[in-house]
From Swiss-Prot:
Superkingdom, natural source: Bacteria
Protein name according to UniProt: Redox-sensing transcriptional repressor Rex
Gene Ontology terms: cellular component: cytoplasm
One GO term of the biological process aspect: negative regulation of DNA-templated transcription
InterPro entries the record matches: CoA-bd, NAD(P)-bd_dom_sf, Rex_DNA-bd_C_dom, Tscrpt_rep_Rex, WH-like_DNA-bd_sf, WH_DNA-bd_sf
Function: Modulates transcription in response to changes in cellular NADH/NAD(+) redox state.
DNA-binding region ranges: 16-55
Subcellular location: Cytoplasm
Record's keyword terms, sorted: Cytoplasm, DNA-binding, NAD, Repressor, Transcription, Transcription regulation
Taxonomic classification: Bacteria, Bacillati, Bacillota, Bacilli, Lactobacillales
The family this protein is said to belong to: Belongs to the transcriptional regulatory Rex family.
Amino acid sequence: MAETKIPRATAKRLPIYYRYLNILLDADKKRVSSTELSEAVKVDSATIRRDFSYFGALGKRGYGYDVETLLAFFKKILNQDTLTNVALIGVGNLGHALLNFNFHKNSNVRISAAFDVNEAIANTVQSGVPVYPMTELKKQLIEQQIEIAILTVPTTVVQKITDDLVDANVKGIMNFTPLRISVPETVRVQNVDLTNELQTLIYFIEHYGQQLGDNGNDDENETED
């Protein structure tokens, strides 16, 4: 069976569904309707049904969705059975927070290596994660076969480090810097600008007020690719 190509907006919602299905399973819930899912995850039911339709018949009319079956399906789609090692580049305040967090609630993802220019941090272990000097970046990424990296570095060096990541065969970058980095088409970048997100939130509150809808989660219902 050929791999299903789905819109980016749908792909962003899949982990939300998966997380809530785990909650339902823990509560010994056997089945769930799209309406129940909608109320829980704040995504309208039509969007949920459309998202699920990309994967074929996941539910039954009049019955809803079998929680255990649906959870097993999304577990496979989201690669939850495979451990993904991630590199953290930059162990400043944000980097330390990410190391402390280290995706403990998502056991298939972990930061397994960190890198920093600070000699006081390099060659130490922080929150159970080894921190290497930046001079070892490419070597360690290649040897450890790490293909995902998180960037929390100054904007003055982010593009140079990005180029090094590409040279080390990194396939995906989560960029916490405000700079938009340049990468080949074969590399996926997810930009996370906390300042921009906060400014956007303030703008919507100031200019739209209650027009966003009952829950204000309009972004969860987007349908564009």
